[in-house]
Amino acid sequence: MRQIYAKQVIMEENKEYCYKYPHAAITADNVVFGFDGKGLYVLLIKRGEGTYEDFWALPGGFMHIDETIEQCALRELQEETNAKDVYLEQFHVFSTVDRDPRERVVTVGFLALVRKGDYSNVRGGDDAKEAKWFNYEQLPQLAFDHQEIIAKAHSALRDRMRSNGLAFCLLDQKFGVDELRSLCEAVFDTKYDRRNFYKKFTSAPYILEDEGEQPMACRRAAHYSL
């Protein structure tokens, strides 16, 4: 017990760890999906000075010694894109040995789902020259292994859409069937028959039809909520 305490004191005084094993750096990378009612978008930043300068990449960065990985993800997202109050969910860890040419880096991937219109004022900050939304089907060449990270995030988005409806975060609180169909087509890269989709969708127990002011003749244009 005394030996452990002594190590803690030494670590506090020297501000460094005492372990003999080399340490990998830890980063957070954020895949922020946005939906505009028709297509799926990804929020990217243009890198500043250093490795992969002027390449587009995911917003993210190195974890500070005094913060959690979740705090790191939120901080980096806000610093580099000005996006605030974003719900982030961890989806995967990427640890390929040579994924970063600078040093040994393990990154934790975070997935975010937003309505693109709510974050139209994104802008580059900190070490990001620029922040911009890109259509998921038209992504530029990316730095590091970020193409792989986005693909994994897209797969995770599909899983969450099937299991817990997380992708509904991309819709307004009240939404039309056609808007949901567009979202599903964007997420699953599949075209759905409008009539069959409507029948399957309206039978879901967690979907409520808005009985507000819609006349019976306009049921196909009705709005729904969770």
Language-model features and meaning:
Residues 42, 47-49, 53, 60, ...:
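Short, His- and charge-rich active-site/binding loops that engage polyanionic ligands
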